[in-house]
Design a protein with these regions (language model features):
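Aromatic- and charge-enriched surface segment that lines or borders ligand/interaction sites
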Residues: 81-127
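Non-catalytic accessory/assembly modules
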Residues: 151-165
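N-terminal lobe/hinge region of extracytoplasmic solute-binding protein
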Residues: 37-86, 194
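Short, well-ordered beta-strand elements
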Residues: 30-43, 89-92, 111-114, 158-160, ...
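C-terminal motif of bacterial Sec signal peptides marking the signal peptidase cleavage site
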Residues: 17-18
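Gly/Pro-rich hinge or "lid" segments in bacterial periplasmic/extracellular proteins
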Residues: 162-201
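Sec-dependent signal peptide recognition
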Residues: 2-9
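Solvent-exposed, polar/charged alpha-helical surfaces in well-ordered, non-transmembrane soluble domains
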Residues: 59, 63, 109-117, 171
Length: 201
């Protein structure tokens, strides 16, 4: 009887060991397709200038620093967010693995250049959101140069100085007007747009 028990234990141990050694098969990559119904109109999908109808689609193909959900702010392109005690200076530390769909790296400089370009060229109704940044409105109105705007980069950190305290500035930057941009997208068809979000058109 003892021999039978030992034999049974040995067999079970072997089976457990064998199962543990099995390498799971690589999950087959499945193309994910997102369908949405949009009103008939011309779509440019430009974060610098977009209609309310385009906003829902923009948030699927582009990503900003954060995303506003029902349960609060979700960090998207940043590792962490810090602010001064008076909420007038905010520091966004970006992830190191951010890339555009064509493989080009996205850095803190990408955001700085994009925000300045948006202030310089956008005529969107949403541009007022950027005016909370120190000097942004004056730069938009061509009164000062870009070096006087409250934006700077240190390593992979985007440091933003505000005119007044904004306790929810991490929510503020979830708006598409704060998304990074690629200038060449202006001349590209919708299916050729260079994006950084989960989907492409």
């Amino acid at each position: 009887m003892k021999i039978f028990k030992l034999l049974l234990i040995s067999i079970l141990s072997f089976l457990l060991f064998a199962c543990g050694e099995e390498k799971p098969e690589e999950a087959e990559k499945v193309e994910q397709i997102f369908y949405t119904v949009m009103p008939r109109q011309e779509y440019k999908l430009n974060p610098q200038s977009y209609s309310e109808n385009e906003r829902a689609l923009l948030t699927q193909i582009f990503e900003g620093l954060t995303e506003l959900k029902t349960d609060g702010v979700r960090l998207i392109s940043v590792l962490n967010i810090e602010h001064s005690d008076d909420y007038k200076e905010w520091t966004f530390t970006l992830r190191d693995d951010l890339k555009w769909s064509d493989g080009e790296k996205i850095t803190a400089d990408t955001y700085l250049d994009s925000w300045l370009d948006t202030l310089e060229n956008s005529r969107s109704d949403e541009i007022y959101r950027m005016f909370v940044v120190k000097g942004a409105k004056d730069f938009y109105n061509k009164k000062i140069n870009k070096n006087s705007v409250g934006l700077k980069v240190q390593d992979n950190k985007l440091i933003v100085s505000l005119n007044t305290p904004i306790k929810n500035f991490d929510e503020w930057v979830s708006n598409p007007i704060f998304y990074p941009i690629r200038k060449e997208n202006i001349n590209l068809s919708l299916d050729k747009k260079i994006v950084n979000g989960a989907f492409k058109v």
